[in-house]
Amino acid sequence: MLKQIKSDIYHLLHPKMAFFLTSVSKNDKPNVMTCAWATPVSEEPPVVIVCVSKESYTAELIKQTKEFVINIPTKKLLGALWICGKISGRDTDKFKRAGLKIIKAKKVKSPVIDGCVGHIECKVWKTVDAGECYAFFGNVISAYADEKYMRNGLWTKEAEIPLHLGGARIVYFR
Ligand SMILES: Cc1cc2nc3c(=O)[nH]c(=O)nc-3n(C[C@H](O)[C@H](O)[C@H](O)COP(=O)(O)O)c2cc1C
């Protein structure tokens, strides 16, 4: 029997990959938050959307500098993923708190997170007010992945990428 779903309707669309979304302020101060709401929307040109709460510091920064980086982690970074998803970078250095090392990105000022297996650097070309979130449409400027975990353009099961089911539940891509 099909049961009517009245709350957390979005859980029907999970699991979704949980990743680190990095951004930067006008004066080059970086931030990171955990994000799961993202999707490709165009292959040619390559465009992705990230959906970010209007209340987050990340939304403020992306609106300021119009860029972001998607950093895809493995199981090893699960602890950091929770930390970056629970506290705001407004008054905390989350990189330090979560023990994350940053590296310079190739084409944008937002940093890349060391130990992640895939990165998508984006410049925002359109922002849509989507209710409680902004949907930031990002033109993909550069994308690269660890060849140990991505073969022939596909993730291998060794990558063990965290997939968010909802709430505190994570499963792994295997
Ligand atoms: C697994 C997981 C997935 C999340 N996905 C999103 C998301 O897709 N969009 C969003 O706005 N917040 C999401 N969050 C919540 C943000 O990470 C959280 O509000 C964070 O503290 C914002 O940080 P900031 O204020 O430094 O930007 C998620 C949290 C977790 C733990």
Features from the language model and the residues they span:
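Basic, polyanion-binding surface patches
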Residues: M1-R174
